[in-house]
Amino acid sequence: MADAAAPGEDDAAWERAIAAAVKNAPFSAPKTLTLDGAVKSTTGRLPSPSLLGRYPSLEELSVAGARLSSLAGLPRLPALRRLSLPDNRLSGAASLAAVAESCGATLRHLDLGNNRFADVAELAPLAPHGVESLDLYQCPVTKAKGYRDKVFALIPSLKFLDGMDAEGNDCLDSDDEEDEEEDEGEEGEGEGDEEEEEEGGEEGEGDEDDEEEGDEEEDEEEGEEEAEDEEDEAGADEEDESKVANGSKGSSGSAQPNKRKRDSEDDANGDN
């Protein structure tokens, strides 16, 4: 009876864990579901397909440390790109066949670290699909002779195995790449702001120089105008003085002939 009740008990625990995980999701149809350590399965299985099947929009699913020994019943997840199942008890081709059937067409990242896969042949169900990154760290298979070469040969789409490419170069996790791109974008924005501030400062200095030059030019023009006004006033004064002088001479010259005329007339009258 206890064995018969175990699956139901597991499902109840899984349902509570899933409800808690999606409670704070920003969308009604979450794209990421993390159940790491949320349930310690008594049956070694995932929850009933109907529980995970409620979220067909999932792109990332993580179920680490749940004591899973089988992936039977993994529902169809047509959008899943990343599946993380480390620290479980998984082994055998059957588990990976369930993965291939559930999300083989879209899956790109598969983490099976610290499980019980012991032979490269167990990975065969992944061969026809597009997995690009596979982690098998701390699995017995990693100790097999020629392990890396054999896995790369088995899965043509594979780019990274246990964090390294076929040449042994470290890969950069996609999350790290996104963080670096954001940092570069922020640095670019910061440099752009500094350049704008410098340009603004140069423009401000240029405006100040222009204003100073304009003020100097205005002062020079005002000085020239004042000088011209003084010259005009001096010229006018000279003209006035000249007119006055000329007028005085004209008056004395004209008076002498009149006096002579009167004297002549007086002489003539006396003779008569």
UniProtKB/Swiss-Prot annotation:
Biased composition (Acidic residues): 164-241
LRR repeat copies, ranges: 57-78, 79-100, 106-127
GO CC annotations, alphabetized: nucleus
Region (Disordered): 163-272
Keywords recorded for this protein, A-Z: Leucine-rich repeat, Repeat
Family statement drawn from the similarity comment of this UniProt entry: Belongs to the ANP32 family.
Protein name: Acidic leucine-rich nuclear phosphoprotein 32-related protein 2
